[in-house]
C-alpha cells in the first residue's frame, strides 16, 4: 500500500549508500544519556512540586510535567520496541521493560500492537487501533477525547495489551510482576515525599486521563488524512515544527519527526533528524512541516465540512 508522507509517496523515497553511511555515523549513547537525564530531571521536578504542594495552582505546573514525563518514557518504550534505542539489545530490553512498566503496561503488549500499526496504518488490521483514524467526524473526535479524559480508553488499552487474543499477546507473569513492582516503587517515592494520595493525584490521574487524551490528539494530527487522493488507499504521516513547550510536553525525543519514523521505523532519535535533512535537501521530495499539534488540532475540530473531516474513497 502506498504511503503519503506530507506530500511524499513512500515508493519515491530511496536513500543512497552515502546517505545511509552518514545516517549511521556517530553513537546513540549520548542521545540516550541525555534523554535519561531529562526524564530524571522531569520526575524530580514532579516530586519537588509535590513536596511543595500548598494550593491547586501547583497542579497547573505538575500536570504538564507529568504528561511530559509520560511522553518521554513512552518514547523510550517506543524506540526499544523498534530496536532503535541503544546498540546493546540487553540494555535496550531492560530499559524498555522498565519504562513501559512505569506507564502501567508491558513492553511485549505494546510492541505487538504498535508494530502492526506500522504494517497496517489506521486500517482494520491495525493492532494499535485505539488510536487509528479510519472514519472520523468532528463528533467522533470529541467523543473519543471525552473517553480518554474519563479513563475509558485507558481501560480498553489495558484489556488490549494484556488480554487481546487478536493481537496474539503473550503477557508473562514476570512482566506483570515488573509492572506491579515499578508502580509500587513510584508509590513509595510519592509517599516518602508527601503522601500516598499524591501518587494517585499527580501520577495515576494524569496517566489515565490527560496523557491518553493528548496522545490521541497527537496521533490524530500525525495521521489524519486532510485531503483525498485518487487511485487507491493511502497511508498518511506528517512531521511537525514545534515550539519548545509543545516539543517538551507533547513531542519529546524527536517524536515530532513522525514522517521520518514511518519511512525508517528502526531509525534512532539521533538518526531521524539526519533523515529529515536529506528529505529537505531533495527539492523533488521536500515534505511540508505542519506548524504544531495544537494548531492542526484546532483546524481539524473546526473545519467547515458538515462535521465530516474526511471520507476515504
Descriptions of predicted regions:
Residues 81, 172, 242-245:
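Active-site-adjacent structural elements in folded domains
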Residues 1-69, 76, 93, 100-205, ...:
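Non-catalytic, topology-defining segments of multipass membrane proteins
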Residues 200-220:
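Aromatic-lined glycan-binding groove of carbohydrate-active enzymes
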Residues 88-90, 179-180, 248-251:
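Short helix-capping and inter-helix turn/linker motifs at the boundaries of alpha-helical repeat units
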Residues 84-96:
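Membrane-interface motifs of alpha-helical transmembrane segments
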Residues 213-247:
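Membrane-interfacial segments at transmembrane helix termini in multi-pass membrane proteins
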Amino acid at each position: 500500500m502506498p504511503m503519503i508522507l506530507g506530500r511524499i509517496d513512500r515508493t519515491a523515497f530511496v536513500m543512497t549508500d552515502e546517505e545511509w553511511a552518514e545516517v549511521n555515523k556517530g553513537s546513540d549513547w549520548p542521545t540516550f544519556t541525555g534523554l535519561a537525564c531529562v526524564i530524571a530531571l522531569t520526575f524530580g521536578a514532579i516530586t519537588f512540586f509535590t513536596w511543595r504542594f500548598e494550593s491547586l495552582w501547583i497542579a497547573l505546573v505538575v500536570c504538564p510535567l507529568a504528561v511530559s514525563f509520560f511522553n518521554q518514557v513512552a518514547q523510550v518504550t517506543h524506540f526499544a520496541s523498534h530496536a532503535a534505542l541503544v546498540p546493546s539489545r540487553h540494555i535496550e530490553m531492560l530499559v524498555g521493560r522498565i519504562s513501559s512498566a512505569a506507564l502501567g503496561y508491558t513492553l511485549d503488549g505494546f510492541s505487538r500492537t504498535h508494530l502492526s500499526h506500522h504494517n497496517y496504518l489506521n486500517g482494520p488490521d491495525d493492532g494499535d487501533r485505539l488510536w487509528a483514524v479510519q472514519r472520523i467526524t468532528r463528533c467522533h473526535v470529541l467523543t473519543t477525547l471525552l473517553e480518554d479524559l474519563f479513563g475509558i480508553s485507558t481501560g480498553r488499552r489495558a484489556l488490549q495489551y494484556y488480554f487481546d487474543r487478536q493481537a496474539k499477546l503473550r503477557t508473562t507473569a514476570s512482566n506483570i510482576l515488573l509492572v506491579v513492582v515499578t508502580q509500587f516503587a513510584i508509590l513509595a517515592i510519592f509517599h516518602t515525599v508527601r503522601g500516598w494520595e499524591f501518587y494517585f493525584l499527580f501520577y495515576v490521574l494524569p496517566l489515565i486521563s490527560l496523557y491518553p487524551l493528548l496522545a490521541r490528539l497527537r496521533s490524530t494530527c500525525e495521521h489524519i488524512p486532510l485531503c483525498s487522493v485518487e487511485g487507491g488507499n493511502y497511508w498518511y504521516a506528517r512531521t511537525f515544527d514545534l515550539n519548545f513547550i509543545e516539543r517538551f510536553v507533547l513531542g519529546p525525543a524527536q517524536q515530532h519527526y513522525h514522517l521520518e519514523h514511518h519511512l525508517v521505523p528502526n531509525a534512532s532519535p539521533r538518526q531521524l533528524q539526519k533523515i529529515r535533512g536529506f528529505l529537505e535537501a531533495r527539492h523533488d521530495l521536500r515534505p511540508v512541516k505542519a506548524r504544531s499539534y495544537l494548531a492542526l488540532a484546532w483546524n481539524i475540530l473546526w473545519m467547515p465540512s458538515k462535521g465530516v473531516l474526511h471520507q476515504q474513497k
